[in-house]
Amino acid sequence: MNEKTINEQYTYIRSLLEEKRLKEALMQLESLLWQCPDWDLRTRLEQLQTSYKYMLEYMRQGANDPERWNVYRKLVADTWEIADRSRLLMLDNASSRYYHEVRRTPRPESLSAYTLKKLLHMLESFNDDLAVSGLLSDEKMDEVLKRHEETLKYMFLQTWTNSAWTPEEEEDAQSMLTSELLPVNDLCLFISAVTLSLMECFDLRKIMWLLDAYRHPDVNAGQRALVGVIFIFHIYRNRLSLYNDLVKRVDLMDEIPPFKEDVARIYRQMLLCQETEKIDKKMREEIIPEMLKNVSSMRNMRFGFEENEDENDDKNPDWADAFEQSGLGDKLREMNELQLEGADVYMSTFAALKSYPFFREVQNWFYPFSKQQSDVIKQLKQEGNEKNTLLDLILQSGFFSNSDKYSLFFTIRQLPKAQQDMMLSQLGEQQVAELSEKSSAETMKKFNERPGTVSNQYLHDLYRFFKLSVRRHEFRDIFKEKLDLHHIPALSNVLYSEDILFPIADFYLKKERWNEAIEVYEEMETIGALQGRGAEYYQKLGYALQKNKKYAEAIDAYLKADTLKPDNIWNNRHLAICYRLNRNYQAALSYYKKVEEATPEDTNVIFHIGSCLAELGQYEEAANYFFKLDFIESNCIKAWRGIGWCSFISRKY
């Protein structure tokens, strides 16, 4: 059986389970297991079938069984788990994916004793080993670094490809969280491995562990774990309700003060990541070309740097005009606003810098930037450990993701020494000092340790992995999917409220994602989450409907807004537009007249009043409006056409 057939059969079984058609799912699973070499799974399936038959028999007899629903849920959950395991085992022999290649490759005898507990002890000793080796020789240090990274790789691959933890492995994983000697960067990599493992196969123990990891005192570990939880909840949204312990655990998490805020923020950041392709296109096609186009014209502009210090206040106001006239000012402001919003503005810059050997290893995409990484430490040693203030500031910046910091570091260090010096000396000593002062170590540290900064950086790392990795086609790309996290039953208590949904709907509106905006706004009306914002709400709903060309529905929304906030000019203008586009010219005319009272010289309003009058056959009055338009706006072709048409129809040649 080939990979495509296996996945098709599994998908069908999954759809049956989602539709609660357990009997058919069991029959299909039995057929699938005939191709599976694991007899334990067949035995488990036979036990499930027996339990299901007994449950049906008790129901036929009319027996009162208060635990029937719990038994049924367990049967469905167990059936799903058997289907998961059988799919993986069969794909191990059929798939060329790296995941299955690792699973089917026999583990060398020398590594067979390396349990998670053993690996933890090895990682805990790294800092001491590195300190001692630094006193001995470079060869010893290289040996320690190499051993550490080989240990991390082995830990990552074994965790990623482990489909289900045993109770002992779960206990060892808990030791990773409580260890005071384990480097936080190593723990972060382990958390990512657990997340990727769950993306391949559901495992309740791992999900519970990620929820525990969210409570870790280090913000990097905690936020990384929560991002993983949200990813997994999105993937397995239809299965979570089968596990009472998990549902209760999530309900209890809601009592942790920052949990709701963290989940809502990550939700918004994930949606923002989906805008990266648009931003990337805008950067490549608009912003960067505009900047390059204006370089030559700005290069010869005298900025007064040669003036005496006493005359520094004599700045030429024409400089600002030059920026604005070139359009460069608007582009730079737009870029700055995107960056402050948390958008990924560096994707286009770093997309071409992921070809270094470092990125050929899957685990390296998820390891936080560290100067103790072997490639980094070697490069720094070659430079004689010279402290580079500017480079340090760049690498410590919270605006770059971890993988981008590695790309930037390798790129700069690959340049000849002369070019490096030229690049890093572009800022004068005074400017570096100012930058250092503004980005003092303490300020930078606080910014980098903000939960929002950490989660955003990690999401950017994940986005790059799913979009740029050489193995990207082997992974499920969450960012391509519809992200409606508030529809996940396990998170409904956390996200289904006005203070969460209103910003989400506004985000969709701002990004011109009209269908999603309409969906969320309508849901808010259903749950009655307006609370004094009714007029604003109906205006925004109407606007989204209008942009989606649903004019009749938009009119209904605008009329509700008009009831709550009468005679609003913006609302009347859009009612007029929708009535006109819906060919109800009489109603459109009445609202255009209301807008005209407030803005009597608005040329667009005057033109559309004339157009509506013409459509209604009132050509003489329409012509008067077109003459008025011609008077206000000279050489107005629209006015001339209107006058000509009305004169022709009225036979006033």
Across the structure, where does each feature detected by a protein language model lie?
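Alpha-solenoid helical-repeat scaffolds
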Residues: 367-565
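Conserved structural position within tetratricopeptide repeats
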Residues: 34, 526, 559-563, 593-597, ...
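Start-of-helix register in tetratricopeptide repeats
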Residues: 224, 499, 533-536, 569-570, ...
